Amino acid sequence: MEEHLFTTQGQAYRIRIAPAAEFATEIEAILAFLIPRAHVEEKYLRNHVPRALVLAVADFEGAIVSVCALKDVNHVHSESVRNSSGYPLPLDLPELGYAATNEHHFGRQLGRHLNEQIILRIKGEAFATVRVGNVAEERNIRRCHFCPRGQTWDRVDNGGKPYQIALWVRRANAPPICDGAPEGVT
C-alpha cells in the first residue's frame, strides 16, 4: 500500500492507494462511507468495491473523508453503458468511479487528488459515468483527460428521482498527469 500526506488549506490528509484487497480489514468502513453518498444501489457497492483494481482513500483525524476507485472490468455493465450511450465503448475497460467526499471537506481538492492518484496507475483506456450536472466531478475528470462521448441517458436514484448520466472516456495515449484544462475538451 502506498501512503502519503496531502496538505490543503492548512489540513493534512493521509492518502492511501492500493488494490481493494489491501483494504480488506477496512472494506466495511469504506462501504459505510460510500453508501449514503452513492448514486448506485448498495448491492452494487458491496459487490464491486471489494474487487476494485485500485482504491484511493483520504483520512482526516482517523476518519475516512474521501474515496475514489478504479473498478474492475465488468463486461455486463460496460455493455449496458455502450447501449445506453450509443458509443462503441470497448467492453474490457476499467471504470473510474465511486468518487465521494464528506460534505465537511468539500472544496479542498480531495476528489481531484484521489483521481490523479488513480490516473497515474491506469494502463490504457478507461471510462467514467458521471451524473450530468455534477460540476466538480466533470471538472476533475476533464482535467484527467477524459472527454464526453455518446449521448446522455436517464436513470432513477434510490429515492425515485430521475437524473441523467454521461459517458466520459480517457484515451490510452492521454498524458499520465491530470493537467488538462477544466473548461476545454482535451
Predicted regions span which residues?
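Conserved active-site alpha-helix within GNAT-family acetyltransferase domains
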Residues: 132-154
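C-terminal "cap" of GNAT-fold acetyltransferases
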Residues: 154-186
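Conserved GNAT acetyl-CoA-binding A-motif
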Residues: 120-133
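Active-site rim helix/loop that mediates acceptor-substrate recognition in acyltransferases
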Residues: 32-69, 74-76
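Conserved acyl-donor/pantetheine-binding loop and adjacent beta-alpha core of acyl/acetyltransferases
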Residues: 63-98, 106, 155-160
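Residue-level recognition of the GNAT/N-acetyltransferase active site
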Residues: 97, 102, 131
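Conserved acetyl-CoA-binding loop-helix of GNAT-fold acetyltransferases
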Residues: 101, 106-120, 139, 143
